[in-house]
Regions:
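Acidic, Ser/Thr/Gly/Pro-rich low-complexity segments and short DxT(G/T)-type signature motifs
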Residues: 4-33
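Sequence-level preference for short, compositionally simple segments enriched
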Residues: 30-312
């Protein structure tokens, strides 16, 4: 830029005309640093919210681009529900080993089944539990275009009791749902993929997970839809585990595909650790693990380039 004072435009104290001045200089525009996250969740009060669900509730509805929520380290003892009107939510954890969403939840129908009265106490079917009525899993995703990274999703009924009944940590029910570097932990029915004809892309709704850890013992990855799991550890928390229970509808394109994964875990009877009352104590069944079994008549499950660390 040039700043110029013409000759004679200014006078000195004696009335003599000023000879003029020309200044040449550059204007430097400082780049605005883009905001990395839209909001921050921190249990210690150092962010915008102290719990995750409040941050989700505040997200504008029907977005068409990602809304980034940073989740600081901490154990968040809450239920998470991402409704259908909240697409494009991205939950970015600080450290998957230290950023944990964990609650105790079961699907017990009464006080006489697996887990007895205690399982019924934590059941989403129990009318006394209004805070968790119809919350079938600790985390439930109904929206499209959801993404999570560096977070552990845990149902502590499964991880602490190591018995049934169903105790889902994750429930996903729409299209374009993805996870990276996350952990999913329970015992029975850890993660259910439940897409329906009403889901976007219908029965062919798509899920993707990479570099994750999925843990359980009974049907711990089950449901339907098209799901690609890559570079992930499937960890059996007892011997004789069953990993998948597929329930695909006729017309499903690909079903469940596990690529470059590792099947690992416990492969022996350990009553000292699990107790003879748990499902783990079944010596007559031997030590083999089961990659999957059909839940209904049209299961599609494929394992590609997958390492098995014990017999099946």
């Amino acid at each position: 830029c040039t700043f110029k004072i013409p000759s004679g435009a200014l006078l000195d104290y004696s009335g003599n005309p000023y000879q003029g001045l020309t200044l040449n200089f550059k204007i430097m525009e400082e780049a605005i640093t883009p905001k990395l996250f839209d909001v921050i969740v921190d249990p210690n009060g150092k962010g915008d919210y102290t719990n995750i669900q409040d941050a989700i509730d505040a997200v504008p509805s029907n977005r068409t681009e990602p809304y980034l929520i940073f989740v600081a380290n901490g154990t968040y003892e809450e239920f998470i529900n991402v409704p259908k009107i909240k697409p494009f939510i991205h939950l970015i954890g600080q450290d998957k080993e230290k950023t944990i969403i964990a609650r105790k939840l079961t699907s017990a129908s009464n006080a006489t089944g697996d887990g007895g009265e205690e399982a019924w106490q934590y059941s989403w079917r129990n009318e006394a539990n209004q805070s968790q009525r119809f919350q079938e899993a600790v985390t439930m995703i109904y929206a499209t275009d959801f993404y999570a990274e560096n977070i552990s999703f845990v149902n502590t009924w499964g991880t602490e009791k190591l018995i049934g009944p169903m105790a889902e940590a994750m429930y996903t029910a729409n299209d374009r749902i993805a996870f990276y570097n996350c952990k999913f932990r329970s015992f029975q029915d850890t993660w259910q993929t439940k897409v329906q004809s009403s889901s976007e892309n219908g029965i062919n709704a798509r899920h993707y997970a990479s570099d994750c850890w999925i843990e359980g013992a009974v049907d711990y990855f089950y449901g339907n839809g098209n799901v690609l799991i890559e570079n992930t550890t499937l960890y059996n928390v007892r011997y004789g585990s069953v990993i998948t229970a597929a329930n695909h509808t006729t017309g499903t394109n690909w079903g469940y595909v596990f690529n470059n994964c590792t099947v690992d875990g416990i492969n022996k009877v350990d009553p000292d650790k699990y107790g003879t009352e748990s499902l783990d104590y079944q010596p007559s069944k031997g030590t083999a693990q089961t990659l999957g079994r059909p839940w209904q008549n049209n299961p599609i499950t494929v394992f590609l380039n997958t390492k098995l660390k014990f017999d099946i």
